[in-house]
């Protein structure tokens, strides 16, 4: 797919799925902005990608003033945005009995408020016919123990994306959702013990974890003209996790 000259904004683009997607868009010719909370991680990402078409923005999109920093960086470039990939996210897994207000607020601020207001602030900067893609998760549908807050954030994102697809349709802006299953990323490593990875792999029909590059390819497809009649849809990229029945 060719994205030469297209302008792409990716939140949470310094590691994992965001980084893999930034690489894919750069390789397809796009100009890419990535955000992250850590300047160090953004520097590492920039060195790894090593392209003049990449710009990094230190911004925690859970904070509205920092969304304004991203908006300013985009507007100063003088170009409208063709693709907005709302990907930043965090997770902690605890039973409802043990969850804290801090757990709740952190995940909803990053996973829901951040996406909502980043979209809101960047809508005026989207070209007509742009593509907006949300990173959700199979947990929005699944009912795994210990995931109540994280799952709730992803369920909320799905509804926001579906309504946005209707609200922005008059400008031919398509809004879609990519919902990964268990994917090998630094984020996954940070929230589950090593022995749990084998369990997650066994819970998929393909009997393995996904790769961030596989999610990136789906994002590029949804952002491309090949998906021009896809709007308000959720794409499960989960190796059969949701529908797999263990034998």
Question: Could you describe each region identified by the protein language model?
Answer:
Residues 7, 14-16:
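Conserved glycine-rich cofactor-binding loop
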Residues 99, 143-151, 163, 246:
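Active-site loop-to-helix junction immediately N-terminal to the catalytic Tyr of the SDR YXXXK motif
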Residues 119, 153, 161:
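Active-site helix of classical SDR
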Residues 124, 166-170, 228:
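Alpha-helical segment proximal to the catalytic Tyr-Lys
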Residues 220, 231-247:
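Short C-terminal tail/terminal secondary-structure segment
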